[in-house]
């Protein structure tokens, strides 16, 4: 066999020329100890706070405590397969989630992975979950109504686009039902050819620490009523680890910010933030952070304020988009003065206070009109609603005051008796069954009838029947009247005369 040295050197030179060295450099550390969803890791010297790390079994974690000799990592998953001495790799990215229209109609976990069995998500972009809220300059004051379809709220405690309105009450008082009805009320604007893009509101529901059956029921109702197509469900259920329950609201908020920053409107319900605070407390105590009041860490206020400040109404230069937040807080025995409730009340622009007593008396939604408030007020109402709802607040306040005194004496003068009668009927008028939100113009006509004395001669038990009959009549014969109120957004003298004529005829024939 003849080997030519010149050929060998030529081949070697070619191979050296084509040699491509690929070196993948990644910083790694080792698990010192693991337990209760927390891993102590040695060796990740350059890791950032909030950075994702990967464990050998594919489970992700987030670096939270950066200490001198180790890093405290919270684990987004089960810690059963993680052992002491396991290798942990930095991923170089802060926690992010998929966002965009591809998520509409889907149920995802706290990290944005689909859990509804409908296959992978289509094209999406990714956003960090924990970003800074918009500053003062890009914002605009809240001035557009966010209609919930509930008379008691739209008339007395109006919510505007970009507002943060707290829904607070004991367990089983209908907090989630208010969120659900508000979602369902956005449906008419999403029907084909119905609304303009600026009328559409995309809905995000974040379930934190709830039973899976409850979340499944919520999704089922949305699906049956055609509201899932414009909604995103983010679920971190009771069986999920605390870090996922902690991050779920931040992930849902990032998904809502996509719509806000693209000039669209989104509504997000956090159900509920008490459980997020509990999850955060658990993580903080296990990370050995010093406890404060009720054993919550010192920055639990900051946790909620930085989340809720991300809800905003942006000005025209920034696209005029909005993100409205409806955080839910569960109280214990109506104690609104506990730590977390007072924190969230001070952060939000008002609260809807639901009471067990009212709920069991059959007043549903069980809104305590005296304690509930919207700090945006009538700026978030159309003029027509202001015209009719202005007097109902005063009348109900007087009614509550008088009702307390009326228990002690029976000999009441005629004006007091009239006030009590009117108040009882207005309270009855504000009741509303679940899953039956009303359009704003329908609410205006119904409340107009209430404040102008059309209910005064009826028995309290007939008020609901009177209202139903009136709505049927308006929808069938007076669609033009409703249309005129919706378009003009105010009750002109001409419309008022028409309304009075319709109501006089209806009241005369009602029996």
Swiss-Prot record:
Coiled coil: none annotated. Keywords: ATP synthesis, ATP-binding, Cell inner membrane, Cell membrane, CF(1), Hydrogen ion transport, Ion transport, Membrane, Nucleotide-binding, Translocase, Transport. It is an enzyme of class 7 (translocase). It catalyses: ATP + H2O + 4 H(+)(in) = ADP + phosphate + 5 H(+)(out). GO terms for cellular component: plasma membrane; proton-transporting ATP synthase complex. ATP binds at residues 169-176. The record marks 372 as: Required for activity. Its EC number is 7.1.2.2. SUPFAM superfamilies: C-terminal domain of alpha and beta subunits of F1 ATP synthase (SSF47917), N-terminal domain of alpha and beta subunits of F1 ATP synthase (SSF50615), P-loop containing nucleoside triphosphate hydrolases (SSF52540). GO terms for molecular function: ADP binding; ATP binding; proton-transporting ATP synthase activity, rotational mechanism. Pfam families: ATP-synt_ab, ATP-synt_ab_C, ATP-synt_ab_N. Gene3D superfamilies: 2.40.30.20, ATP synthase alpha/beta chain, C-terminal domain, P-loop containing nucleotide triphosphate hydrolases. It is a peripheral membrane protein. It is found in: Cell inner membrane. F-type ATPases have 2 components, CF(1) - the catalytic core - and CF(0) - the membrane proton channel. CF(1) has five subunits: alpha(3), beta(3), gamma(1), delta(1), epsilon(1). CF(0) has three main subunits: a(1), b(2) and c(9-12). The alpha and beta chains form an alternating ring which encloses part of the gamma chain. CF(1) is attached to CF(0) by a central stalk formed by the gamma and epsilon chains, while a peripheral stalk is formed by the delta and b chains. Produces ATP from ADP in the presence of a proton gradient across the membrane. The alpha chain is a regulatory subunit. HAMAP family: ATP_synth_alpha_bact (MF_01346). Belongs to the ATPase alpha/beta chains family. This is ATP synthase subunit alpha. The gene is atpA.
């Amino acid at each position: 066999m003849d080997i030519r040295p010149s050929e060998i050197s030529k081949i070697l030179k070619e191979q050296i020329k084509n040699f491509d060295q690929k070196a993948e450099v990644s910083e790694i550390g080792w698990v010192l100890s693991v337990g209760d969803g927390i891993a102590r890791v040695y060796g990740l010297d350059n890791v950032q706070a909030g950075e994702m790390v990967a464990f050998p079994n594919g489970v992700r974690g987030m670096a939270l405590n950066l200490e001198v000799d180790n890093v405290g990592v919270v684990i987004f998953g089960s810690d059963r397969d993680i052992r002491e001495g396991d290798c942990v790799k930095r991923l170089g990215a802060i926690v992010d989630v998929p966002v965009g229209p591809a998520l509409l109609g889907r149920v995802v976990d706290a990290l944005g992975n689909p859990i509804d069995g409908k296959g992978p998500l289509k094209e999406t972009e990714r956003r960090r979950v924990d970003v800074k809220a918009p500053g003062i300059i890009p914002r605009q004051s809240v001035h557009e109504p966010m209609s919930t379809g509930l008379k008691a709220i739209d008339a007395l405690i109006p919510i505007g686009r970009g507002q943060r309105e707290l829904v607070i009450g004991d367990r089983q008082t209908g907090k989630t039902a208010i969120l659900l009805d508000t979602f369902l009320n956005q449906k008419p604007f999403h029907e084909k050819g119905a609304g303009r893009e600026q009328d559409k509101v995309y809905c995000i529901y974040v379930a934190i620490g709830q039973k899976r059956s409850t979340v499944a029921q919520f999704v089922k109702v949305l699906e049956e009523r055609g509201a899932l197509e414009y909604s995103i469900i983010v679920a971190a259920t009771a069986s999920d680890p605390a870090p996922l329950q902690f991050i779920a609201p931040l992930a849902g908020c990032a998904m809502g910010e996509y719509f806000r920053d693209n000039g669209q409107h989104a509504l997000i319900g956090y159900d509920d933030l008490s459980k997020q605070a509990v999850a955060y407390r658990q993580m903080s105590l296990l990370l050995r952070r010093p406890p404060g009041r009720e054993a919550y860490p010192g920055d639990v206020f900051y946790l909620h304020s930085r989340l809720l400040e991300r809800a905003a109404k942006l000005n025209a230069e920034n696209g005029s988009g909005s993100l409205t937040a409806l955080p839910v807080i569960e109280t214990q025995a109506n104690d609104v003065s506990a730590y977390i409730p007072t924190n969230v009340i001070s952060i939000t622009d008002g609260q809807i206070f639901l009471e067990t007593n009212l709920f069991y008396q059959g007043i549903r939604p069980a809104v305590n009109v005296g304690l509930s408030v919207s700090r945006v007020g009538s700026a978030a109402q159309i003029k027509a609603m202001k015209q009719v709802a202005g007097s109902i607040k005063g009348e109900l306040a007087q009614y509550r005051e008088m009702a307390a005194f009326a228990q002690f004496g029976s000999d009441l003068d005629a004006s007091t008796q009239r006030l009590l009668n009117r108040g009882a009927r207005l309270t009855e008028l504000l009741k509303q069954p679940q899953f039956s939100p009303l359009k704003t113009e329908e609410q205006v006509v119904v409340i107009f009838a209430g404040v102008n004395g059309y209910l005064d001669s009826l028995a309290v038990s007939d008020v609901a029947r009177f209202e139903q009959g009136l709505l049927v009549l308006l929808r069938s014969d007076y669609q033009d009247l409703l249309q005129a109120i919706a378009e003009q957004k105010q009750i002109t003298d001409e419309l008022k005369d028409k309304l009075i004529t319709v109501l006089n005829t209806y009241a005369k024939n009602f029996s």
